[in-house]
């Protein structure tokens, strides 16, 4: 077996691992709904603490705590991507109609495909652009039924316009994080645990500054929070990191548009949403 074939095989395996994040994010909406009325920053603080703690235990068991000793730029990209995306997203939803803001924020897979062309040795092919554009069109169709009058209906409202701008910033932050992670592939995936723990601390500070605490009402809500921390807000970030660093970044970007569709199916199957052609919020 040649070196090139081994490298291609490793890339394909990493891409499959990265696709696991998309499957996990498909359960995000269901688990978030199951967690009750907990404020967003409080929920982020709890779930990122679980996800980061899980990664910390794993790194310690493997004797890999040295993975946290990374240059400042690695921490800036990691924490900026995780906390920056969620902080901007929460702020956008407070100002703009949720379905429309979510659709704008969900430009990130398309931006990943486009930005990947800036990486050394990468080429942007027409099929990737077409695939990403079709994926965005499909996601737009899912959200269209929930849009409250369309983006243009709120264009003169300065606060709503700010919400759209924040949602667009979300898309740039997450796509930038994903593409820059490829440039920083020397940083081990275990470092993501540190990013999660810092994100949890920043979310806790934001919660106490801007929100009123609400405790989970029952064991089912606690189970949903733990599920979020272990899955969509935990393992998903680790496998995404490995995938974007070692797999086919463009394919992962295109495939990410499957998340809203899968999320819709899960919500309908669980009885949290009617079986219609629209979706109120994205899986990521």
Model regions and ranges:
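Transmembrane alpha-helices of multi-pass small-molecule transport proteins
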Residues: 14, 37-84, 109-115, 169-177, ...
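Cytoplasmic-side transmembrane-helix entry/capping segments in multi-pass membrane proteins
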Residues: 14-18, 70-79, 124-137, 186-197, ...
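Helix-helix packing/entry segments at the starts of transmembrane helices
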Residues: 16, 46, 101-107, 180-201, ...
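Membrane-interface helix termini and inter-helical loops of multi-pass transporters
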Residues: 30-38, 94, 143-159, 207-225, ...
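Specific alpha-helical transmembrane segments that line the substrate/conduction pathway
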Residues: 42-53, 89-123, 170, 249-269
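Hydrophobic transmembrane alpha-helices of multi-pass small-molecule transport proteins
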Residues: 50, 55, 77, 115, ...
């Amino acid at each position: 077996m040649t070196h090139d074939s081994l490298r291609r095989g490793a890339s394909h395996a990493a891409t499959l691992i990265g696709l696991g994040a998309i499957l996990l994010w498909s359960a995000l909406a269901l688990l978030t709904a199951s967690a009750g009325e907990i404020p967003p920053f409080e929920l982020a603080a709890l779930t990122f603490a679980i996800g980061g703690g899980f990664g910390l235990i794993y790194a310690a068991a493997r004797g890999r705590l040295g993975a946290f000793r990374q240059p400042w730029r690695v921490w800036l990209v990691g924490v900026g991507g995780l906390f920056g995306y969620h902080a901007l997203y929460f702020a956008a939803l407070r100002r703009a109609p949720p379905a429309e803001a979510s659709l704008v924020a969900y430009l990130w897979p398309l931006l990943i495909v486009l930005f990947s062309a800036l990486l050394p040795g990468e080429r942007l092919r027409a099929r990737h652009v077409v695939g990403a554009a079709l994926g965005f069109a499909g996601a737009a169709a899912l959200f269209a039924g929930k849009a409250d009058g369309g983006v243009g209906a709120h264009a003169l409202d300065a606060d709503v316009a700010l919400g759209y701008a924040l949602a667009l910033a979300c898309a740039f932050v997450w796509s930038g994080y994903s593409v820059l992670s490829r440039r920083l592939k020397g940083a081990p995936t275990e470092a993501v645990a540190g990013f999660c723990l810092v994100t949890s601390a920043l979310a806790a500070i934001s919660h106490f500054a801007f929100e009123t605490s609400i405790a989970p009402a029952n064991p089912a809500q606690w189970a949903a929070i733990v599920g979020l921390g272990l899955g969509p807000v935990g393992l998903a970030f680790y496998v995404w990191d490995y995938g974007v660093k070692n797999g086919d970044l463009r394919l992962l970007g295109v495939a990410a548009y499957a998340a809203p569709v899968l999320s819709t199916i899960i919500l309908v199957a669980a009885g949290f949403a009617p079986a219609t052609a629209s979706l109120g919020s994205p899986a990521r």
